[in-house]
Design a protein with these regions (language model features):
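Positively charged n-region of N-terminal signal peptides that target proteins for export
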Residues: 1-4, 17
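Sec-dependent N-terminal signal peptides
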Residues: 4-12
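Function-determining sites in protein domains
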Residues: 16-133
């Protein structure tokens, strides 16, 4: 019985831990999202916010399953800031159905995480001019 209690405790602790990327972005006070012209690095549009709730929601999107980076074009990037200093730049892909991902450098390691449909829909709405969170 002790053995099962210990395993249950370990799972409970593990499930309560915050991911490394969410920890890194904790306390960020501004975010800039840029959208590129298709197939280029030229900025088509940018959106920024200082709303804590919005920043936390978007930061949570980055906490997806680790994936191998795809070979499609990037659609834009996100820049998270804290007290005027850049904390984490993130590039993203969402326009192709088989290529939804975020790519960022976390503690000198390039990470690529799967973008869920909610995140893709959110970015599509922002690029279309809708500013809702």
């Amino acid at each position: 019985m002790k053995y099962y209690a210990m395993i249950l405790f370990m799972f409970a602790v593990a499930s309560c831990q915050t991911s490394t990327v969410v920890k890194k972005l904790k306390g960020c006070d501004s975010l800039v999202i840029t959208f590129n012209h298709p197939g280029t690095d030229s900025v088509l549009q940018s959106v920024s916010t200082t709303e804590t709730k919005a920043i936390q929601k978007i930061a949570g999107f980055l906490d997806g399953k680790a994936v191998t980076p795809g070979s499609c074009d990037f659609n834009g990037n996100m820049l998270f800031f804290k007290a005027g200093r850049q904390v984490l730049p993130v590039v993203f892909k969402y326009s192709s159905d088989n290529c939804h991902e975020f790519v960022f450098d976390l503690d000198n390691k390039v990470m690529s995480t799967k973008m869920d449909n909610e995140a893709a829909d959110f970015l599509k709405s922002l690029s279309g001019g809708k500013n809702w969170y």
